[in-house]
Every structure is written in C-alpha cells, then in structure tokens.
C-alpha cells in the first residue's frame, strides 16, 4: 500500500529570514538548556546527590520518576490556553519556575538543612522541572511547527542537537572540576560534598533566566481567526479521537513509551553502577559521564539532522533506538574505564526525545501539534514507573537484572516500530 504524500515545503507563512531567526532562537535556547544539563536533565546528578545523602536506590530514582509522572500538565495547558498569542508567555513563566526551584536546592544545601529536608527539596526539583519542562517542550514544538517549514525542520534539529550538546560538554567539564580531584580539563575546584552540589545548582539558576530572552525573540505567525469555545471543544474531541485511532500517532506513542522506558529510565542505574565498576568511593566520575553523554550527543545530533533531510521520520526513530540497544549491550559486556563509553552511546541515543515528537508533529495538523505532543508527554509520564521498577529490581536482584530488562524493552520497541509505523506520516486531515 502506497504511503501518503508528505507535507509540502511551503507549509510556513514566514519568510526565509524569519524562519532562519526561529531556527537560530531554537538552537540558542537548547544551547543554554544543555549548558545547565547537569541540573536540568533530571536523573544522574539528582540520583547521586540523594545516594550520597544516604538514601536507597529506589529513593535515588524518585526525582526522575516524579519528573515523568508530572509531565501530563501540558495537556491541560494545551486545552485551556490554545491561543497562539500565548505561546511566548508559556515559554517564559515555566523558565522562571525552574530557576526558582533550582535556587531553592542550592539554598537548602547552603543552610545545612537535614538530609531528609534536602531529599524532599531535590525530589520537588524533579517535580517542578517535570511540569515546567512539559509545558516548555510542547510549546516549543508548536512554535517550531508554525515558524519553520517541514523541509527546514531537519536543519533546525541538526543545529539545535548538534551544537547544543557541545555546551553540555562545557557544563560537564565544569561539573567534573567541582566533583573530581583529577578532572579531564586539568583543573579542580577542590569542592567536597555537599559544597560541590551547592555550587552546581547555584550557578545554573541565573543561566536559566537568560533563556527567557530567547523565548521572547521567536517570530510566531498568528492565524486570522482564533477558535471559539465551541469549536475548540470539537477540536479537543477530534484531536483525542485522532490520537487514539490514527495509526502513526497511536504506534508512535507506544514506541515512545517503550524506548523512553528502556533507554532513558535506566540511566540512573547505569550511573550508580559506575561507582562499583570503577571502584569509586564517591561519584567522582559523574562529570566524565556527562561529558561523554553530551559529546556523543553532539556528534550524533549533527549526523542525525543530516540523516533526516535525506531519509524520513521513521528512520530516525529506528536509528536512535538502535543506538540505545548498542549502549545497553556495552553496559552489560564492558568493565573498567571503558564502561564510561556507555554514557556516550546512551547519550547519543537519547536524541529519540527529539525525533519522536518530530514524528508526532509531522503527523499532526498545526492546531493539534501542542495537544498531541502533550498527549505524548502524558504517555511518557508513565515512564516514571519504569524508573521505580528498575530501582526495585536493582535493590532485590542487582543492577545487571535491570539492565537486561531495559534491553529487552528496547528490542521490543524496534520490532513494533519497524512493523507498524509509516515512513512518511502526514496529518489525518491531509490524507
């Protein structure tokens, strides 16, 4: 059966210069996000901080789990604040919230509050980032869908996720200087626990506020007519019907859930296991982990962006998932310092987080992009249970058992996507 014709190249009303500005803003936004990645990527830093406070593996996995559970909020925002004129405010205010809770973690450590209180604040940090990042990311996808043509989206993703991770490498080197006595960059700040975490969170908070300037610089084309309450209700109902009945959206969401569960939720256990493999007394290699994670992501980001311009959205889903499978095989088979390469492979594979929303956005009409990406986030919120599951498996049967579980989930996802997803999806109303 032949596949539908993909969207045309002129599906954006903005001029090439305005689209280039949006691509630049999108890339700049992600550069700052990546620069603060040791804090904004809820997982490794949070898990190791809670572990050093004396918590179990399950508690150490809670920030990542709570982050996932609370990513459903964007659905309500997309339903009740659908107007394109609200896109910029919906970028700015979540950034203010993220900066505030990040400062709160630094203050809790500075004031030498009890480990229990700091644990609660760190878990709350994961919760606030879960709600705020969910709104940010769904809004960004609508901005990109409205402000950049389909034919140029590969360039936007290539620049954002090729150049952006280089900034994460800088952030990781800074973290390594804070946490290790023999960092890669040759400079150590000599910070002991918990001052190293204090400086890390305190430095990230003001950088997050700079992102608001970029958020205000996007050019967003506004439709001539805003939907009325009644028409919006019909759009919501129709959008829900499409999301749960239209094949590219349904199987795209299922694939996303499986890949997220197998390739991202396991990351905390992979990091915790590094201490045993490397015989570390503390998480001194965490900066190296992050550097490799984002260094590989930068190389993969440029290559994958180019690959998207030459192939199709489905190829990107299979490619990123395959990279994650290779990463988990590395975790299971390699010991010693070479074990750290697994963070690079898994980091490169993490770009599934860009190409699954792209697949969903390509399958959606412009008015439904934010809602459909929000529904995808709702599906992703259940990944939090995978984080807790991996923690429980680790506590009972050991971390190796959790790694085998994650690898099996990824392989199942690849088989499903290869069999069920069309290569070039189009919105339901264009078929």
Task: Please give the residue ranges for each predicted region.
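Hydrophobic core of transmembrane alpha-helices in multi-pass small-molecule transporters
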Residues: 31, 101, 116-136, 338-352
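Structural signature of the two symmetry-related core transmembrane helices
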Residues: 89-105, 315-330, 407
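Intracellular juxtamembrane helix-capping segments at the cytosolic ends
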Residues: 134-148, 351-365
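Helix-loop boundary and gating motifs at the non-cytosolic
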Residues: 4-73, 78, 248-290
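Loop-to-transmembrane helix entry/capping segments in MFS-fold secondary transporters
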Residues: 57, 150-159, 283-284, 364-377
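Helix-to-loop junctions at the C-terminal end of transmembrane segments
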Residues: 73-87, 179, 299-313, 394-395
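Juxtamembrane intracellular "pre-TM" segments in multi-pass secondary transporters
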Residues: 3-20, 221-253, 431
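C-terminal transmembrane helical hairpin of 12-TM major facilitator-type secondary transporters
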Residues: 314-353
């Amino acid at each position: 059966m032949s596949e539908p014709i993909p969207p045309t190249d002129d599906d954006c009303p903005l001029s090439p210069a305005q689209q280039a500005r949006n691509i630049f803003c999108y890339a700049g936004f992600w550069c700052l996000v990546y620069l603060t990645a040791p804090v904004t990527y809820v997982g490794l830093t949070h898990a190791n901080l809670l572990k050093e406070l004396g918590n179990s593996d399950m508690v150490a996995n809670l920030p990542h789990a709570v982050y996932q559970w609370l990513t459903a909020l964007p659905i309500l925002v997309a339903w009740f604040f659908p107007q394109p004129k609200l896109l910029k405010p919906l970028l700015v205010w979540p950034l203010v919230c993220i900066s505030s809770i990040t400062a709160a973690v630094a203050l809790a450590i500075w004031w030498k509050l009890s480990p229990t209180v700091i644990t609660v604040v760190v878990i709350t940090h994961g919760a606030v980032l879960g709600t705020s990042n969910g709104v940010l990311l769904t809004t960004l996808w609508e901005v990109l869908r409205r402000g950049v043509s389909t034919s140029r989206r590969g360039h936007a993703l290539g620049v954002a996720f090729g150049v952006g991770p280089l900034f994460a490498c800088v952030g990781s080197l800074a973290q390594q200087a804070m946490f290790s006595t023999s960092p890669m960059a040759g400079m150590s700040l000599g910070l002991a626990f918990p001052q190293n975490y204090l400086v890390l969170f305190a430095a990230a908070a003001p950088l997050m506020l700079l992102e608001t300037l970029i958020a205000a610089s996007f050019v967003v084309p506004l439709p001539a007519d805003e939907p009325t309450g009644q028409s919006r209700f019909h759009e919501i109902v129709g959008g829900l019907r499409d999301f749960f009945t239209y094949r590219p959206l349904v199987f795209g969401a299922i694939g996303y859930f499986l890949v997220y569960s197998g390739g991202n939720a396991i990351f905390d256990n992979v990091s915790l296991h590094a201490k045993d493999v490397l015989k570390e007394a503390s998480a001194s290699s965490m900066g190296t982990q992050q550097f490799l994670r984002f260094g590989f992501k930068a190389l993969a980001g440029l290559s994958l962006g180019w690959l998207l311009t030459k192939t199709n959205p489905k190829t990107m889903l299979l490619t990123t998932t395959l990279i994650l499978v290779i990463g988990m095989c590395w975790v299971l088979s390699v010991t010693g310092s070479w074990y750290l390469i697994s963070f690079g492979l898994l980091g490169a594979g993490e770009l599934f987080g860009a190409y699954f929303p792209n697949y969903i956005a390509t399958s959606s009409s412009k008015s439904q992009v934010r809602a459909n990406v929000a529904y995808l986030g709702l599906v992703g919120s259940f990944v939090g249970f995978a984080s807790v599951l991996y923690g429980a498996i680790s506590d009972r049967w050991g971390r190796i058992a959790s790694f085998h579980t994650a690898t099996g989930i990824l392989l199942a996802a690849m088989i499903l996507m290869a069999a069920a997803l069309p290569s070039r999806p189009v919105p339901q109303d264009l078929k």
